[in-house]
C-alpha cells in the first residue's frame, strides 16, 4: 500500500495510520522499507511507543535504536518502478493507439480516469450519475483528449455481491462505453502502464494519486457532488 505523505508532527494524521505501523509483517520482518524519511520517523515513533512504554528510559533507548536500524526510509519499490519506466518502454495495444492518435499522426492528451470501489459503495447512484457526466464530457471532447478509464479491479466482485442493483446499472455504463469505442477501457493488471502513458490523472482519491504526482503528472480528484458542468 502506498500512503499519502503524513507530517510526523500531525498527531491526528499519525493516529489515523498507526494500524499500518503495527501489522505483524512490520514486527516479524528483518527489514522494513517505507516510502520516505518522514514515514520512517512515524514508524519508529509508533513502534517504539508500542513496544517500550513500560520499560526503563535506558531500555527505551535500546528499543528505539532497534526500530531505527530495522526501518529504512529509502522509498517504495512501486514508486521506484514507475519512476524508472519511460513511455518509450511501454507496449501499447493497437486498439489504444487508434484512440490516442489524431488524424495528423500526433497524439491527443491522455487522461487517466481512475474509479474506486469505496466511492461506489459510499455514494452509490451519485457515482453512476457522475460517471455518465464524465463520459459525456470526454465523448464531446474526444478529438483533443483520449480517456483512459481504469476502474479498480475489485469493483466487479465487490459491487456485484454487496450492491447487485447498483452493479447492473454500472455494468450497462461500462458495456456502452466499450461498445462506442471512442475511449480506452483498461482492465489489465498493469497499472504502471496507465500512469506512465497518461498526461494527467482524474478520478477518485487513491494510492495512485501519489504515484502520479511522483511521476510529475497533474492530478485532479473528482467530486461526485458536481455534475452537469465541464469543470469542477
Identify the function of each model-found stretch.
Residues 1, 186-230:
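A donor-sugar binding/catalytic signature common to diverse glycosyltransferases
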Residues 1-3, 38-40, 77-79, 116-120, ...:
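Short, solvent-exposed loop/turn segments at secondary-structure junctions
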Residues 31-33, 72, 148, 200-202, ...:
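Hydrophobic/aromatic beta-strand patches that form the interior of the parallel beta-sheet core
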Residues 25, 104, 193-194:
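Structural alpha-helical scaffold elements that stabilize or flank donor/cofactor-binding regions
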Residues 61, 76-170:
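Conserved catalytic-core segment of nucleotide-activated headgroup transferases in glycan assembly
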Residues 1-83:
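Active-site and donor-binding regions of nucleotide-sugar-utilizing enzymes
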Residues 30, 109, 196-199:
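Conserved acidic residues
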Residues 163-187:
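Nucleotide-activated donor-binding/catalytic signature segment of Leloir-type glycosyltransferases, i.e.
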